[in-house]
Regions:
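Active-site helix/loop module of the DD-peptidase/beta-lactamase fold
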Residues: 1-34
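Structural helix-adjacent loops and short alpha-helical linkers that scaffold large soluble proteins
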Residues: 1-7, 54-62
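Extracytoplasmic/periplasmic, Sec-exported soluble proteins
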Residues: 2, 35-39, 94-96, 121
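Non-transmembrane alpha-helical segments in soluble domains
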Residues: 7, 11, 45-52, 68, ...
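Sec/Tat-exported extracytoplasmic proteins
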Residues: 10-18, 41, 48-55, 71, ...
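Active-site Gly/Thr loop motif
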Residues: 17-23, 65-119
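Active-site-proximal alpha-helical segments within enzyme catalytic domains
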Residues: 35-56, 100-117
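Short, gly/Ser/Thr-rich active-site loops of penicillin-recognizing serine hydrolases
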Residues: 122-141
Length: 141
């Protein structure tokens, strides 16, 4: 099961404080791998920190390089690679289906988690949110 693999390979290794949940496609069904992973903000931050650090705790150096280097430009002119968005050079951004964000700024040694419950039709809002997260990250240092 996907949830068991995720627990063993990531959740336990980052030292998550809380159990996470994953929506399934039906009663006793399979996890929706494309979405619907639910966790506490501090545990999302742990994942962001682990991916941003040089530690191979949850991902190899080559996998981290793949995540951090956009291969295509998509919406808003952002780069994209392997489920990771790149709204600005050097910035990594994981986005959930309804407004969950894990923003990584290695230059400022910052990870910001933003949890939301937004409609999927909130077009254009991600660009504004990324801009605010960038401003917060740059001002904190």
């Amino acid at each position: 099961r996907l949830a068991d693999e995720f627990s063993d390979r990531i959740w336990k290794k980052v030292g998550a404080d809380y159990n996470a949940t994953w929506n399934v496609d039906k009663v006793n069904g399979h996890e929706k791998a494309f979405c619907c992973f639910n966790a506490a903000a501090r545990d999302y931050a742990r994942v962001g920190l682990a991916l941003m650090s040089g530690s191979p705790k949850i991902a190899s150096t080559s996998w981290k390089a793949r995540l951090s280097n956009p291969i295509v430009n998509l919406d808003y002119g952002w780069g994209y690679a392997a489920q990771m968005w790149h709204p600005y050079p050097g910035i990594n951004l994981m986005m959930g289906l309804h407004g969950q964000y894990i923003y990584q700024d290695p230059l400022h040694d910052t990870v910001i988690v933003k949890l939301s419950d937004m409609p999927t039709s909130a077009d254009g809002i991600s660009d504004k949110i990324a801009s605010v997260l960038r401003e917060i990250s740059e001002k904190k240092s």
